[in-house]
Amino acid sequence: MRILMLAHRIPYPPHTGDKIRAYQVARHLARGHELTLGFVIDDASDRAGLEALRRDIPDLEWGGLWKPTALARGLAGLAMGGSLSIAYFRSGRLARRVSRRLRDRAYDAVYISSSPMVEYVRGTTLPVVMDFVDVDSDKWAQYASKQRPPLSWVYRLEGRRLRRFEAEAVRWGHRCILATAAEEKLLKSFAPWARTAVIPNGVDLAGYGPPADGPTIIFTGAMDYFPNVDAVQHFCADVFPAVARAVPSARFLIVGLNPSPAVRKLGETPGVTVTGAVRDVQPYYRQSSVCVAPLRIARGIQNKILQSMALGVPVVATSAAARGLECRPGEHFLVEDDPARLAEAVVGLLRDGAARTALATRARAFVEGHHSWAAVLERVEAIVMEAAGEHPARSAPNRVSVSAAGSKAGATRP
């Protein structure tokens, strides 16, 4: 089967949640089918991953963006009645290449990873499977609640515009995949016509070991991503001081690429270390006794929680971070929102090795049973094959005009 897959960023290296899922899906589909993977590169350093990615997926198409220009285009799109996100990820180069591929090659199905990429195939007669993962429009609404005007106005407006786009896009998609039942319910609240499927994120089950004995706490993630920045600022200001008073030798590791200036500033706090980008997070997990996910803004499944559970590090999370998970608080992880109670939960685990081991063991069993990549990817592949099987005329090349992703008409007004 011939599949065209489009991702909003190069899924390599797979070190953030969206890239991990896209990379796993692309690699799996490329093993059993003829896969063309198209994506946008908006960070020049990401080009270093092209050759490594090509070893897994030989057939690549990509278009580059310069962030300042893309942001200006996004804001202009918002001002003209469209979505900032859709306009931001519009690459003329990628649009032309996708159009040529659809014109010259007989694909059986299209797989979209992230909603902005829908614009590149608008008008195709091929079946389109849309893996939205999360409802991004609601994320913008959450951002707005944490900002002051005028930024809050921009975020709130983008949330409304993107929601309008999402509702229209799912009208002609064969199936829309969400990572959690909560995200599915949210999408159907404003797009009841959507044909949906819930497929959770998977996790790499290699590298499991007992939690460390030292008083080290870890948080991982892309540290220029606003929800992560807000989470570690909240933890350092409102939670870690109480932990450090109870356990003076406690350390807090903030592990992840592109730390913002605000995050780097946290590294000046006694007991707090900001690593920046690392080649492999597993060594940092192996020296950690507890993983925290103190997010106040969160969508879908937090990969950082699944990864910690898979590696045998017990987790303390907020209810926002835990919302997309089917595991049970108290049995597989601890959930607290009040800063004082969150600190107590962390301190309790730091002091009680038996409790750490018991919680980690139950959590590992849960992810083995519910989040293995093998099971997740089989379900994704089945939906793509079902879509191709229902398509009545997939033998002839399709035609999608370049304007589908590049013109003023239709590009930002679904």
Question: Which ranges hold each PLM region?
Answer:
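N-terminal subdomain of nucleotide-sugar transferases
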Residues: 1-61, 103-105, 406, 413-414
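Donor nucleotide-sugar binding/catalytic pocket of nucleotide-sugar-dependent glycosyltransferases
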Residues: 129-130, 137, 155-208
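Acceptor-binding helix/loop patch of EC 2.4 sugar-transfer enzymes
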Residues: 8, 67-88, 130-167, 185, ...
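Short hydrophobic beta-strand element within catalytic cores of glycosyltransferases
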Residues: 304-307, 314-318
